[in-house]
């Protein structure tokens, strides 16, 4: 979907974010929003938003930011091919294992993925000199960073009924991961 709308030979994608429905269908694990941020060769920044509408992702097209803040030449594009099913399964399983080993007697069940954000921090125009001087900074600016949230319910808690609505308490746990799939709970 993203590759259909963003020509990666002309633009460098630096951030892609997926979010589930945060309304009536929350906890149903339905991907509803996709946001993509990218830069063109003239250092213009763009945001492209997709929303699930009637079973299809739609977009109004990219929005160009008025300010030039990031360097196209120095920024490393996000490797979309690295974000595949195997990688997602790997970090999801590691995150779930961290939660299960951390809880005290709670019977938590994974209900949904609330958000995934994949990012290679773009090099800001104000840091181009630092990028040119520092090999360490250059290496840091090429690393994919992942933030994600998983939603759990405690099976020992009963749902609450408020009129005709059923309210389920859930716990959101935030995680970070790297390109190698190492996962940590995000403080």
Predicted regions, residues:
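Compositionally biased, low-hydrophobicity segments enriched in charged and small polar residues
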Residues: 2, 26-35, 42-75, 85
């Amino acid at each position: 979907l993203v590759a259909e709308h963003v020509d990666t030979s002309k633009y460098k994608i630096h951030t892609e974010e997926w979010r589930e429905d945060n309304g009536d269908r929350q906890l149903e694990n339905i991907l509803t929003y996709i946001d993509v941020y990218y830069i063109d060769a003239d250092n213009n920044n763009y945001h492209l938003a997709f929303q699930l509408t009637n079973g299809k992702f739609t977009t109004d097209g990219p929005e160009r930011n008025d300010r030039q803040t990031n360097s196209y030449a120095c920024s490393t594009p996000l490797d979309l091919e690295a974000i595949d099913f195997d990688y997602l399964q790997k970090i999801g399983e590691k995150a779930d294992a961290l939660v299960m080993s951390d809880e005290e007697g709670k019977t938590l069940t994974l209900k949904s993925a609330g958000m995934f954000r994949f990012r290679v921090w773009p090099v800001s125009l104000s840091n181009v000199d630092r990028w040119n001087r520092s090999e360490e900074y250059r290496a840091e600016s090429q690393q994919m960073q992942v933030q994600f949230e998983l939603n759990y319910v405690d099976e020992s808690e009963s749902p609450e009924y408020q009129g005709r609505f059923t309210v389920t308490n859930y716990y959101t746990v935030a995680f970070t991961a790297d390109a190698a799939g190492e996962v940590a709970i995000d403080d």
